[in-house]
Amino acid sequence: MDGFREENLSYAPDLVIVGNAVVRENPEAVKLHHMGLNFCSMPQALNRFVAGGKTTLMVSGTHGKTTTSSILAWILHEAGLDPSFMIGGILKNFDSNYRLGNGPYFVVEGDEYDTAFFDKGPKFMHFR
């Protein structure tokens, strides 16, 4: 798919994940509302499909969240704990910003940015 167009939802997906950069007037947001499709924010999806059943380790603060989250994920990996993570930057040790591990931990950055146009609460409130 290239760009935001209502035709992108013509196949009626089971769930639409809406990013925080999408505005209410976005053609796909309007279409999913008119079609009555199920939707959620990225933090809600991560909590439901990735973090569910895992212990969430949230790193917050003014500076250094990406670095600290990356170090924490690497320590857990090196300890043999096979962590999952979703981090704002690309981790050099993993060559990715996300990983779906089988271990008991999910590492995520906790920032104060809003979740989506339909949820102005901070993203970190979706992880408990």
Where are these regions (language model features)?
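Phosphate-binding loop of NTP-binding sites
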Residues: 7-13, 20-128
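Long, basic/Gly/Ser/Thr-rich N-terminal segments
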Residues: 1-2
